Amino acid sequence: MTHLLSRLACATVLVVASTCALAQPAELEGVKLEQTTQVSAAPLVLNGAGLRTRAFFKVYVAALYVPKKATDAATLLSQTGPRRVAITMLRDVDAATFAGALNDGLKDNHSEAQLAGLKPQIDALNAAFKQVGEAKKGDIIQLDFAPDVGTRVVVNGQQRGSAMAGDAFFSALLRIWIGDKPADGGLKKGLLGG
């Protein structure tokens, strides 16, 4: 009986400890990542986060927030409802370079026909980043999607440009990081919760 009680006590301690650990923000490269957030009042959970590197430089930490966690790209891409990619800059990058990298990621993961169908949204994305000027170290760029609004670019709490309509466009953006040809394989693994 004493053995059973001590096992139950240990199990209780483990459950409480793991619950407390889940409630704490995660941290990557000094960037605190909340376990939950909201877009358009809809609750989202942190699916995963990772580091984007270019050559030997640490460029940004990206975090993916979704309605329901998943570990494979296809499931994440098929989810509907509000979602967020939160990017915290680790170095200064001019907006043209940042937008160019996003455009390259779109081209790498979509056919010419698919890109042609997304041209108005891609143009709006480029215009939004043109308003940003330079993304500075510590800036937080959120790509927020809500079905009734579309995709918004929010930099340090301020929307830039106009919203880009369509669930398909947000999924296209996600493919930059979790598609078949991701911008960074390690980042993809992190966003998938790996």
Language model: regions and residue ranges:
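Bacterial N-terminal signal peptides that target proteins for export
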Residues: 1-10
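N-terminal signal peptide c-region/cleavage motif recognized by signal peptidases
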Residues: 18-21
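N-terminal secretory signal peptides
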Residues: 24-79
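Short aromatic-centered micro-motifs
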Residues: 37, 152-154
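Mid-length scaffold segments of soluble, non-membrane domains
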Residues: 70-148
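Short strand-turn-strand beta-turns centered on an Asx-Gly dipeptide
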Residues: 155-159
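Flexible glycine-rich active-site/ligand-binding loops centered on an Asp-His dyad
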Residues: 162-187
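Short, solvent-exposed mixed-charge patches
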Residues: 193-194
